[in-house]
Amino acid sequence: MIKNEQPPLSFEEAMEQLEEVVEQLEQGDVPLEEAISMFQKGMNLSKVCHEKLATVEKQMDQILKEDGNFEETVLQEEQE
């Protein structure tokens, strides 16, 4: 891992940060330039959450496939 590179966020961490961004933007007292930056951060966090949910959905489908036989296969998390 590169020095400045942060480890990937968990779903819960991304949701918490996204909720904070939304709350700040909803207050409406953020300068325009900062609001645009926050909006972009929120969109990125939303993408992280969506990707993690999609990965979990694929794992659940894999577990429940083939006539209800419970067969778990761990899938690699999709990377950009």
Swiss-Prot record:
It catalyses: Exonucleolytic cleavage in either 5'- to 3'- or 3'- to 5'-direction to yield nucleoside 5'-phosphates. Bidirectionally degrades single-stranded DNA into large acid-insoluble oligonucleotides, which are then degraded further into small acid-soluble oligonucleotides. This is Exodeoxyribonuclease 7 small subunit. It comes from the Bacteria. HAMAP family: Exonuc_7_S (MF_00337). GO terms for cellular component: cytosol; exodeoxyribonuclease VII complex. Belongs to the XseB family. One of its GO terms (molecular function) is exodeoxyribonuclease VII activity. The gene is xseB. The lineage of its organism: Bacteria, Bacillati, Bacillota, Bacilli, Bacillales. It is found in: Cytoplasm. Heterooligomer composed of large and small subunits. The keyword Oxidoreductase does not apply. Pfam families: Exonuc_VII_S.
